[in-house]
């Protein structure tokens, strides 16, 4: 039994990459509906792939002794078609369904139109996927961050971390809930702390660009609350102190860390509050 790939995961991955590199929007194509059980249909696909490859400056077509035609063996034609298709994929093309194309076009439209083009303005002059390596001053632990984007005050007036998040949340409230559940404040706080320490610049703004991979396939640009980021920085430094203790004691506990000191890993268990609801009265009438 093989689990099928989930289309929403592919869309999420593509959307994330395309907002980092908008040219990818132009590399998603819907293949023509040609009968692949006939030589004419296979030849039509060969012409289609050749037209795509002809647009690529880095592609050098192989010198051929013979041009594909109906005179070729059918299996040889199909192998030739498959090689061309794979070459397109190697050059960055993705082939998708008509429905998926409509979704991607919606994301593309929102990318360019949202807030009068604010996303492009925020990313003008920004650096993408740059790693920052440093050492925490308090714990002396090595640290590294790799934000999706960052921009500086000379370009946009502030030193900002810019994060992209794809989501299956159907509204902003659900997305905020997911951010808290996944502790995004910790990672965003860590980005600011590490980048500020290494560069000497005060990165104190985080802008998050949300990309929906479910209807209505919308986009939102979110300015993170300073209070939430301060909370995240506190959690980050607290986590570093725990990691330092683990290294010093050469002991990396699991759930036994939840037990009280001296309890030897035995955890006091308590059910959540919602389980304490009173039983509702039930009337069982005797109609005899």
Which residues does each predicted region cover?
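Alpha-helical structural motif
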Residues: 11, 99-103, 187, 232-239
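Hydrophobic/aromatic-lined pockets within catalytic cores
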Residues: 19-24, 166-169, 196-200, 244, ...
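Intrinsically disordered, low-complexity coil segments
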Residues: 55-59, 114-117, 136-139, 153-159, ...
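Helix N-cap / beta->alpha transition motif
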Residues: 96-97, 225, 272
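Mg2+/Mn2+-dependent nuclease catalytic core
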Residues: 123-237
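Glycosyltransferase-associated regions of secretory-pathway enzymes
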Residues: 135-145, 153, 168-169, 257-287
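Polybasic (Lys/Arg-rich)
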Residues: 230-277
């Amino acid at each position: 039994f093989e689990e099928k790939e989930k289309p929403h995961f592919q869309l999420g991955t593509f959307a994330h990459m395309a907002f980092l590199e908008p040219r990818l929007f132009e590399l998603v194509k819907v293949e023509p509906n040609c009968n692949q059980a006939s030589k004419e249909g296979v030849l039509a696909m060969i012409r289609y792939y050749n037209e795509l490859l002809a647009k690529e400056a880095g592609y050098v077509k192989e010198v051929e002794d013979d041009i594909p035609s109906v005179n070729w063996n059918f299996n040889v034609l199909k192998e030739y078609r498959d090689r061309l298709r794979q070459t397109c994929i190697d050059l960055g093309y993705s082939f998708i369904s008509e429905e998926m194309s409509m979704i991607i076009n919606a994301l593309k439209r929102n990318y360019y139109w949202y807030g009068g083009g604010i996303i492009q303005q925020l990313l003008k002059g920004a650096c993408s996927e740059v790693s920052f390596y440093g050492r925490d001053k308090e714990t002396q632990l090595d640290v590294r961050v790799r934000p999706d984007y960052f921009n500086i005050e000379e370009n946009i007036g502030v030193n900002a971390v810019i994060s992209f998040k794809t989501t299956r949340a159907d509204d902003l409230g659900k997305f905020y809930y997911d951010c808290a559940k996944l502790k995004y404040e910790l990672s965003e706080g860590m980005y600011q702390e590490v980048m500020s320490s290494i560069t000497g610049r005060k990165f104190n703004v985080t802008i998050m660009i949300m990309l929906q991979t479910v209807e209505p396939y919308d986009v939102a640009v979110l300015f993170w609350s300073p209070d939430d980021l301060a909370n995240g920085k506190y959690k980050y430094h607290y986590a570093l102190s725990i990691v330092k203790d683990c290294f010093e004691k050469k002991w990396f506990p699991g759930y036994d860390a939840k037990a009280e000191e001296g309890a030897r890993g035995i955890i006091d268990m308590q059910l959540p509050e919602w389980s304490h609801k009173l039983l509702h009265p039930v009337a069982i009438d005797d109609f005899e």
